[in-house]
Amino acid sequence: MTTSARDTGLDSHELARLHELARHSHAVITRHQDAGGAYPAAPTFSAYRGYAWLRDGSFTAEGISRYGDVASAGRFHDWVDGVLRRRRGQVDDLLAAVDRGEVPSNEGMLPTRFTFDGNDGSDPWWDFQTDGYGMWLWSVVTHAARHGLDLERWRAGIDVAVDYLLAFWDRPCYDWWEEHVEHRHVSTLGAIHGGLVAVGTCAALRSAPWSAATLQVAARIRSLVSAEGVVDGHLVKWLGSSAVDGSLPACVVPFGLVPPDDDVAAMTRAAVAKDLDVDGGVHRFAADVFYGGGQWILLSALLGWNLAAAGDTAGALRHLRWIADQADADGDLPEQVPHHLLHPGSRAEWVARWGTVATPLLWSHGMYLILADELGLLPPAAKDA
């Protein structure tokens, strides 16, 4: 439930600062949105330049939708729909291979990121990741419900994403961080669950031929994670692991794999906070060496979002304030910050390889908008953007 700004106890100066970062976040996202609708992950970062991820974009679109910019979010969903329509034949070929008893190669699966014109691109990447397809289903259904839009506009793309996930939801793949292709990751399963439940419970999609199957698979995901993805009362990084990951709160909010008031949800929030939260900034996982293993803006917002949903307004506000403190002189938010590094000795090699940390990261700005909205801290005119 969204909090009112008056419940946060902020003075006028801090409220103005948080409002200004929200306005800037909207401006950064929309300024860099491609003419075709894609949200670039990070417009100037060497390894991301020229590409858009469904994962980053789905959360970014949610932030923009909450801000009230229906047109910008709609253009992103138009872009994804168009990309997936053009992948109809590829998915049909994959499904036919499965029907023949074949196991398609990872290289034959849909990619996790696309060029702005919807192609795979020529740069090698850790491309087989299924989470973004579930995230997009959740994002587009949520956007349509919020603003009273007709999902027929995106129905062809929805069909492709659903068919793909129903066939390959339980296949090991790379995780949110593009690592460990050999495992089935709980945050990936959570994202798929969220997408399948979103379309399966949507009244406007009830007549779809896959409607019942989406909820059946979602139930199978819940059973699987309950049996193999919970250790010491909390969700874990992958099935069979005991470690936590900063992405795990997404399995609670927004993806509903575990209800927010469930003991597993509370234990997961607590485990992530204990192992990964330092002064309001959340790390990805304990073994993270990427740029030294810093604190990620988007994960701090994700934990804050979950705390807000659980009724911990003070805890959520702590994360929002921390995020606001990380903005650079231009107001831009990076992917991660180096104030507390888990493995500082590894930072230099990544700087040498790819340059300085991605800034701005549109996903960071989108997550700020989401958390600000949860706390009732979007600027008064934002909903009319």
UniProtKB/Swiss-Prot annotation:
The record's Pfam families line, in alphabetical order, gives: Glyco_hydro_15 (PF00723)
SUPFAM superfamilies, alphabetically?
Six-hairpin glycosidases (SSF48208)
* Notes on temperature effects: Optimum temperature is under 35 degrees Celsius.
Q: Which residues bind substrate?
A: 125
**Active site annotated at which positions?**
175 (proton acceptor), 178 (proton donor), 335 (proton acceptor)
**GO terms for MF:** hydrolase activity, hydrolyzing O-glycosyl compounds
pH dependence per the entry: Optimum pH is 6.7. Stable between pH 6.5 and 11.2.
Localization of this protein:
Cytoplasm
According to its UniProt entry, one GO biological process term is: polysaccharide catabolic process
Write down the chemical reaction(s) this protein catalyses. Answer: isomaltose + H2O = beta-D-glucose + D-glucose
List the EC numbers from the record. 3.2.1.205
Q: Does the keyword Hydrolase apply?
A: yes
Any keyword Transcription?
no
Give any Gene Ontology cellular component: cytoplasm
Mostly located where? cytoplasm
Q: In the record, which residues are listed under signal peptide? A: none
The family line of this record is: Belongs to the glycosyl hydrolase 15 family.
UniProt xrefs under PANTHER family: GLUCAN 1,4-ALPHA-GLUCOSIDASE, TREHALASE
Function, as annotated, reads: Involved in the intracellular degradation of the cyclic tetrasaccharide cyclobis-(1-6)-alpha-nigerosyl (CNN) formed extracellularly from starch. Catalyzes the hydrolysis of alpha-1,6-glucosidic linkage from the non-reducing end of isomaltose to yield beta-D-glucose and D-glucose. Can also act on panose and isomaltotriose at a lower rate. It displays low or no activity toward CNN and the general GH15 enzyme substrates such as maltose, soluble starch or dextran.
Recorded protein name is Isomaltose glucohydrolase
- Tell me which species this is from: Kribbella flavida (strain DSM 17836 / JCM 10339 / NBRC 14399)
